[in-house]
A protein has these predicted regions:
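Short, polar loop motifs at secondary-structure junctions
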Residues: 29-36, 102
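Substrate-positioning beta->alpha
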Residues: 164-171, 185-208, 215-219
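Short-chain dehydrogenase/reductase
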Residues: 78-82, 114, 125-137, 166-170, ...
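Conserved Rossmann-fold NAD(P)-dependent oxidoreductase catalytic core, especially the SDR/UDP-sugar
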Residues: 86-132, 151
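N-terminal Rossmann NAD(P)H-binding glycine-rich loop of SDR-like oxidoreductase domains
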Residues: 2-22
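NAD(P)H-binding glycine-rich loop region in Rossmannoid oxidoreductase-like domains
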Residues: 35-36, 41-95
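Conserved beta-loop-beta element that borders a ligand/cofactor-binding pocket
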Residues: 104, 137-162
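Mid/C-terminal beta-alpha module of Rossmann-like enzyme folds, strongest
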Residues: 2, 203-267, 282, 287, ...
Length: 316
C-alpha cells in the first residue's frame, strides 16, 4: 500500500495518477474529504492535525507521501507543520513505512536562489522558510538516527493544468483571461524556473519506488531553459490569442493589498525570490533518470490553456 497524505491538492491527485499508471494499484488517498482519482483507490477520511488519525492512516503502508498543504499563513504553519511532521515520522517508524516529503525551496539562503542545487545552503531569510527548514531538519535527523528511510522531493514554484495555487497562473494567466495586463512580482526581466505539476508527480512516484533514491534530497525535473516574467507573459498571451501586457507589482503594494487579500500580505516576505534570477537545477535527477522527458514550457502552457477552456472550473 502506498499512501498519500493530502491527496486533494495540486500534487496529490497527479501523484495518485502517476502511481497508478506506472507503479501500483494499491493506493490510499487521505484527506478530510478524499475523492477517488483511480478506480481502485482506497479513500480514507482523516484530520491530519490529529496524531491518532495520522497513525491510523499510515498503518499498513509501505510508502507514505506528504503532499498536504496547510493554509498559507505563518501562524498556521508554525502551529501545524512541525507537529504534523513529528507525528508522521513517529508513525512511519512504528509501521516501518518509508517517507517521501514533497518540499519547496523556501529554506534556501537568499544568495542561493540564482542557482539552487540539492547542496545549496539552508539559511532562510523568511519566517516561513525557517518553518520549512525545521521540517527538513526533523526528517534528516530521523534518517541519520536510522529511525526511518526517507527522501525529500523538492520542487520550484510550480504551474500546471487545473490548479488554483500557482503564482504564475494567478498573476499572469488569470489576468490575461480577463483581458487585463498580467502582473509580475519583482522585475519582469529576471528569469524564473517553474516546475510542471504532472512532471513533479511522475518524478516523485519514480523516486518513491526506487529503493536507492532514499535518504537524500532530490530536485524534481524542471526545464533548464528558464524564462523572464516578460517571456512567460508573451508565451501565455500567444497561446491565448491575447495582447502581451505585463506590469510589475511593487513590493510595497503587497503590504497594502494584503489588507484586502491576506495571502498577498503573507507572500510579502517571499518577494526576494522574484527580485533576482531564480534557477532551479535538477541535473542530479536527470543524471539518475536520463529517460525522463521534461515538459517544455510551451507545451506546459498549451496544456493549461486547453484545460481551462475545456473546463472553466479550477481546482483549489
Amino acid at each position: 500500500m502506498q499512501t498519500i497524505l493530502g491527496s486533494g491538492g495540486a500534487i496529490g491527485s497527479e501523484l495518485a495518477k502517476a502511481l497508478y499508471q506506472n507503479h501500483t494499484k494499491e493506493i490510499r488517498l487521505v484527506s478530510r474529504n478524499p475523492k477517488r482519482v483511480n478506480p481502485t483507490d482506497e479513500l480514507y477520511s482523516a484530520d491530519l492535525s490529529n496524531p491518532t488519525e495520522i497513525d491510523a492512516a499510515i498503518a499498513g503502508s509501505e510508502v507514505v507521501y506528504i503532499t498536504i498543504g496547510f493554509e498559507y499563513k505563518l501562524k498556521v504553519w508554525r502551529e501545524k507543520w512541525p507537529a504534523f511532521i513529528r507525528s508522521v515520522i513517529e508513525s512511519c517508524t512504528n509501521h516501518k513505512a518509508k517517507l517521501v516529503f514533497f518540499d519547496n525551496v523556501y529554506m534556501y539562503a537568499k544568495e542561493e536562489i540564482p542557482h539552487m542545487t540539492e547542496e545549496s545552503k539552508m539559511s532562510p531569510p523568511s519566517e516561513k522558510g525557517k518553518v520549512r527548514k525545521q521540517l527538513v531538519d526533523l526528517i534528516l535527523e530521523a534518517v541519520k538516527a536510522k529511525k526511518i528511510s526517507a527522501l525529500i522531493a523538492r520542487s520550484a514554484d510550480f504551474y500546471g493544468p487545473g490548479i488554483g495555487t500557482s503564482m504564475l497562473q494567478e498573476t499572469v494567466f488569470k489576468n490575461l483571461q480577463k483581458d487585463k495586463a498580467a502582473q509580475w512580482l519583482g522585475g519582469v526581466n529576471f528569469k524564473h524556473s517553474f516546475t510542471f505539476t504532472p512532471d513533479a508527480a511522475q518524478a516523485t512516484a519514480m523516486l518513491g519506488n526506487t529503493p536507492n533514491a532514499y535518504n537524500q534530497v532530490w530536485h524534481l525535473p524542471t526545464h533548464s531553459d528558464t524564462l523572464t516574467g516578460k517571456e512567460w507573459t508573451e508565451l501565455f498571451a500567444h497561446q491565448m490569442n491575447k495582447k502581451a501586457k505585463v506590469s510589475p507589482i511593487p513590493k510595497f503594494m503587497l503590504k497594502i493589498l494584503g489588507w484586502f487579500i491576506p495571502i498577498l500580505g503573507e507572500f510579502y516576505e517571499m518577494t526576494y525570490q522574484y527580485e533576482q534570477p531564480y534557477f532551479f537545477d535538477s541535473s542530479k535527477f536527470m543524471k539518475r533518470f536520463p529517460e525522463f522527458k521534461i515538459t517544455g514550457y510551451q507545451e506546459g502552457v498549451q496544456q493549461i490553456v486547453a484545460q481551462a477552456y475545456q473546463n472553466t472550473d479550477v481546482k483549489e
